[in-house]
C-alpha cells in the first residue's frame, strides 16, 4: 500500500508537472498562419507576400519576426517602400503584387513587421 509520504510525493510531482506546462508569455502567431485583419490586405498578403515571408527557406524576414524586421523598420518608410517597389536583394519588384498601391504596401509591411508604418 502507498505510504503517506509516497502519496504526497506523487501529488507534488503531478502538481509540478502541471505548473511547468503553464507559461505566462503570450503565444506568438507564426508566420505561416498570420493574416492581416483587413480583408483586402489579407487577400493581397496571401497571394503575394506569404510565399516568401512565411517561408523560412526564402531568406526573407518572416512575418512577425520583430528581430529581423527591426533594422529594416529603422531605415524608415521611404526606404522600405523603395525596396518594395523596386526590388531589393532577393525581393522582386513590387513583391509580385502588381495591383498593390503604395498605401497597401505600407499596410502589408507594417503587418509583417508588427508595427504601424506611415
Question: Model-found features: residue ranges?
Answer:
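The canonical Cys-X-X-Cys-His
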Residues: 45-55, 108, 112
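Gly/Gly-Pro-rich "capping" loops immediately C-terminal to redox-active cysteine motifs
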Residues: 54-82
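Axial heme c-ligation environment in periplasmic c-type cytochrome domains
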Residues: 61, 83-116
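Short sequence/structural segments immediately N-terminal
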Residues: 38-46, 117-118
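Bacterial N-terminal signal peptides that target proteins for export
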Residues: 1-11
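Bacterial signal peptide processing site
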Residues: 22-26
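Short Cys/His-rich Zn2+-coordinating modules
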Residues: 29-36
Amino acid at each position: 500500500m502507498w505510504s503517506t509520504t509516497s502519496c504526497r510525493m506523487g501529488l507534488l510531482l503531478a502538481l509540478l508537472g502541471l505548473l511547468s506546462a503553464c507559461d505566462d508569455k503570450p503565444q506568438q502567431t507564426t508566420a505561416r498562419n498570420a493574416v492581416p485583419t483587413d480583408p483586402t490586405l489579407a487577400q493581397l498578403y496571401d497571394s503575394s507576400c506569404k510565399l516568401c515571408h512565411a517561408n523560412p527557406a526564402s531568406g526573407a524576414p518572416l512575418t512577425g519576426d520583430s528581430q529581423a524586421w527591426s533594422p529594416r523598420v529603422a531605415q524608415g518608410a521611404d526606404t522600405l517602400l523603395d525596396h518594395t517597389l523596386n526590388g531589393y536583394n532577393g525581393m522582386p519588384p513590387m513583391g509580385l503584387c502588381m495591383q498593390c498601391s503604395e498605401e497597401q504596401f505600407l499596410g502589408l509591411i507594417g503587418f509583417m513587421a508588427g508595427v504601424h508604418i506611415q
